[in-house]
Curated annotation (Swiss-Prot):
Purpose: Catalyzes the 2-thiolation of uridine at the wobble position (U34) of tRNA, leading to the formation of s(2)U34.
SUPFAM superfamilies for the chain: Adenine nucleotide alpha hydrolases-like (SSF52402)
Active-site positions on this chain: C107, C205
Location, primary (coarse class): cytoplasm
Site for Interaction with tRNA, residues: H133, Q350
Name recorded for this polypeptide: tRNA-specific 2-thiouridylase MnmA
Organism, scientific name: Shewanella oneidensis (strain ATCC 700550 / JCM 31522 / CIP 106686 / LMG 19005 / NCIMB 14063 / MR-1)
NCBIfam families from the UniProt entry: PRK00143.1, trmU
Family to which this protein belongs: Belongs to the MnmA/TRMU family.
UniProt entry keywords in alphabetical sequence: ATP-binding, Cytoplasm, Disulfide bond, Nucleotide-binding, RNA-binding, Transferase, tRNA processing, tRNA-binding
């Protein structure tokens, strides 16, 4: 399909300014394209006064410096209540149920592209919003808008944005999605932006780089239990199943076991009923492999999902190689996905995101694994 460009002149864009390099360059590029640009900084977590992990004040300072340099307004908004209700409580409930959620995906759905868009609409009278995500949008002549992978394969963030609606994608601009990361940093450097060499943020969306076990333990009581081999031999103890995920190799504290080979130990299963962490040696241990999965809570960006029997590709985690697969609908909200080859460490609670070439079709939540 042929792509068409939106008319830029006079259109007002509210850019989500995070205090990082990607949003900084996004604002600059949109100004170059003729948009009327303003920034909006979101505060989504109420940190303690002595909180060493949250850098919200520093990020706001950097965002303000960038906006001052570009000569644009910076607005601020507090979405902490919305974040707690719609993202953090979901995050805790999933961990409590023994699954491994992805809060960044929920944050994009509920905060960055919902609460933010509503605020930009109602208060700031925006035509578009923009974020520093590495994805692209394509406006087609038939009136549809598609979300595409970012040009930089290593930074592509479409996996985190699959829950966006067609309408949200149509109202959003992603300037850095057309660029490689090194190009973004070079533009920021050339423009003298303070964020040009600022490191990328990591950790839980908006909560920062806390020690995860310590942070989670503040909200959910830990339940220590045994670590067993796949054969049922007790070889250690864990502090709580919620601290572990399938395929995990580090932090198990069970190296140098007698009668074991030199292969590293991996988490291969979590027995919720017995509160037992099951481990096995080798990254392709049979208990770690799946032939497929059941995926529910389906969402398709353009409202129409792939047809029954489609042979496409899926990612079950960020930055994973594409996995060829075949889809079968069990009902309107459940997909049976069969992989062409067995896949390691597919994790219930995580998202499965489907692609047709460069187009991100949508996805759902991994509910059950198909083994054997």
């Amino acid at each position: 399909m042929t792509s068409i460009e939106p008319t830029h002149t006079g259109k007002k864009v509210i850019v989500g300014m995070s205090g990082g390099v990607d949003s900084s360059v996004s604002a600059y590029l949109l100004m170059q394209q003729g948009y009327q640009v303003e920034g909006l900084f979101m505060k989504n977590w109420e940190e303690d006064d002595n909180d060493e992990y949250c850098a919200a004040a520093e990020d706001l300072k950097d965002a303000q410096a960038v906006c001052d340099k570009l000569g644009i307004k910076l607005h601020t908004v507090n979405f902490a209540a919305e974040y707690w209700d719609n993202v953090f409580e979901y995050f805790l409930a999933e961990y409590k149920a023994g699954r491994t959620p992805n809060p960044d995906i929920m944050c994009n759905k509920e905060i960055k592209f919902k609460a933010f868009l509503e605020f930009a609409d109602d208060i700031l009278d925006a035509d578009y919003i923009a974020m520093g995500h590495y994805v692209r949008r394509r406006d087609n002549e038939d009136g549809t808008t598609q979300m595409l992978r970012g040009v930089d394969n290593n930074k592509d963030q479409s996996y985190f944005l699959y829950t966006l609606s067609h309408e949200q994608v149509a109202r959003s601009l992603f300037p850095v999605g057309e660029l490689e990361k090194h190009e973004v940093r070079e533009i920021a450097k050339q423009m003298g932006l303070i964020t040009h060499d600022k490191k990328d943020s990591t950790g839980i969306c908006f909560i920062g780089e806390r020690k995860f076990t310590e942070f989670l333990g503040n909200y959910l009581p830990a339940q220590p239990g045994n670590i067993e081999t796949a054969d049922g031999e007790v070889i250690g103890t864990h502090q709580g199943l919620m601290y572990h995920t399938l395929g995990q190799r580090k932090g198990l504290g069970i190296g140098g076991m007698k009668n074991s080979n030199d292969d590293p130990w991996y988490v291969v299963d979590k027995d919720l009923k017995r509160n037992v962490l099951v481990v096995g040696q080798g990254g392709h241990h049979p208990r770690l492999m799946s032939n497929g999965m059941l995926v529910n809570q389906l969402h398709w960006v353009d409202r129409k999902g792939p047809i029954n029997g489609s042979q496409i590709v899926v990612k079950t985690r960020y930055r994973q190689q594409d996995i060829p697969c075949t889809l079968t609908y069990l009902d309107d909200n459940t997909l049976k996905v069969v992989f062409d080859e067995p896949v390691a460490a597919v994790t219930p609670g995580q998202s499965a995101v489907f692609y047709d070439g460069e187009v991100c079709l949508g996805g759902g939540i991994i509910d059950q694994l198909i083994r054997g």
